[in-house]
UniProtKB/Swiss-Prot annotation:
Active site: H115 (pros-phosphohistidine intermediate)
Cofactor: Mg(2+)
Domain of life: Bacteria
Name of protein: Nucleoside diphosphate kinase
Organism: Roseiflexus sp. (strain RS-1)
Record's GO cellular component terms: cytoplasm
Family: Belongs to the NDK family.
Keywords: ATP-binding, Cytoplasm, Kinase, Magnesium, Metal-binding, Nucleotide metabolism, Nucleotide-binding, Phosphoprotein, Transferase
Positions with a binding annotation for ATP: K9, F57, R85, T91, R102, N112
GO MF annotation list: ATP binding; metal ion binding; nucleoside diphosphate kinase activity
Stored NCBIfam families: PRK00668.1 (NF001908)
């Protein structure tokens, strides 16, 4: 099973979108195995977004992600990376399809509400940045038999 890190960014928290976004995640049948409200400090932000270091938007990205509380969660499941990214929508909300989180709730690329891991390898790396193993729960729901083959 793959794992994906999802971050509901400061704009999602400030706009009161935690509930609607979590509802979509749960209604889709995704299994949440870790979740916390936290403030990302600059050191963690720089490690998480290290791939973007040196790009023109890097400093503003760090300022943005550290500007307020975020909700960080880990979801797990078969093909979870692809599923979550299709739910999230294009990075630029202008290009995000209606029905996606960004397509329905975001308007600007600089305030695009949500982060999701882009590969199984990055998912594992990102999960380890934000969660200790003991913070994650092994969860099996009675509905799993109706979701996964």
């Amino acid at each position: 099973m793959e794992r994906s890190l999802i971050i509901l960014k400061p704009d999602a928290v400030q706009r009161g979108l935690i509930g609607p976004i979590l509802t979509r995640i749960e209604q889709r049948g995704l299994r949440i195995v870790g979740m916390k409200l936290m403030q990302i400090d600059e050191s963690l932000a720089r490690r998480h977004y290290a791939i973007h270091e040196g790009k023109a938007f890097f400093d503003s990205l760090i300022t943005y992600i550290t500007s307020g509380p975020v909700v960080v969660l880990v979801v797990t499941g078969k093909n979870i990376i692809e599923i979550v990214r299709s739910m999230v929508g294009a990075t630029n909300p202008v290009k995000a399809a209606p029905g996606t989180i960004r397509g329905d709730f975001a308007l600007d690329i600089g305030r695009n509400l949500i982060h999701a891991s882009d590969s199984p390898e990055n998912g594992e790396m990102e999960v380890s940045l934000f969660f200790r193993p003991e913070e994650l729960v092994e969860m099996h729901r009675s509905t799993d038999q109706w979701i996964y083959e």
